[in-house]
Amino acid sequence: MRITHTFRLGIGAAAIALAASACGGSDSATVDGHARDGELTIGIKFDQPGLSVRGQDGSFRGYDVEVAKYVAGKLGVPPERITFKEAPSAQRETMIMNGEVDFIVATYSITDGRKEKVDFAGPYFVAGQALLVRMSDTDITGVESLNSDRKLCSVKGSTAVQNIKDNHAEYIQLLELDTYSQCVDKLRDGSVDAVTTDDIILAGFAGLAPEELKLVGETFSLEKYGIGLKKGDRETREKINDAIERMIADGSWQRAFEETIGPLGGSTLTPPVIDRY
C-alpha cells in the first residue's frame, strides 16, 4: 500500500493529540490538577466529636474539617467543591496510594513508618495519647494502673494501638475495633474499662458525655498530626505547608480550635512548627 504525504500528516497529528491528551490526563490526576479543575476529594473521619463529624443532614463539622477547608481554599477550591470521604485509620495509606483521595486530614500522626508509604505536610497540631474511662472508675488513674484484668479498646492501624503493643502489651488486654466511637460505646456499656487514643480525640467524646466519661492520667506519647498525601508530590506538600503556616499566622488556626474542640473541654497548645523535610 502506498502511504501518501497526507496520510503521514494525519498519523502525526493524531499522535500529537494523543500525547497531549495523555499529558493532560496525568496532570489532572494530581492534587494540583484537581485543584485547578476546582475540586478536591479529602479524607476525614466521620465520627470524632469536635474534630470531624458527619451530621444527619450530610454536612461536616469539626477542627479537622476546618483545617481541610482552609487548605483547600488556599489551593483555590471553595468548600462547596470539596468531596469528603471517610478515611478509617487502617485504610489511610492505601486510600492515598490508590488515589481515592487527594489528601487526608484525619488526626493522622506523622511516623517514620508511614512516611515510607506517603508524605506529610505539617504538623498542624500536636497531641498526646491518653485514657478515657467511666466517671465512676477511681481505680484507673493512668496507663501504669492498667493490668491484665482490665480491658482496653483502641482502633486498628492507629499509633495508639502500636504504642500499647510496643510498650504495654505484656499486662494489658487490648481490643481493636474499626472506629473510636465503637470503642466508646463499649466503654459506656461496660464491655471495656478504658479507651486509649490521643487526648484531643478523647476530649471530644468526654465533652459529649461529661456526666459519664472522663480523661485520666498524663499523656504518654507525642502525636504530630500531619496532612497525608501521595509520596513524592513535593509541590503540593509545600503548598499545604504554606497554607498551614498562613492559617496559624492569620488567627484562623486558633479560631477553628476554639469553635470546635474548645467547647468540649479541649485546651489548645502552642502552634506547631512545620517540618519541611
For each predicted feature, which ranges?
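Acidic, polar ligand-binding/catalytic clefts
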Residues: 82-145
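A ligand-binding cleft/hinge motif common to bilobed small-molecule-binding domains
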Residues: 91, 107-117, 163-166, 188-222
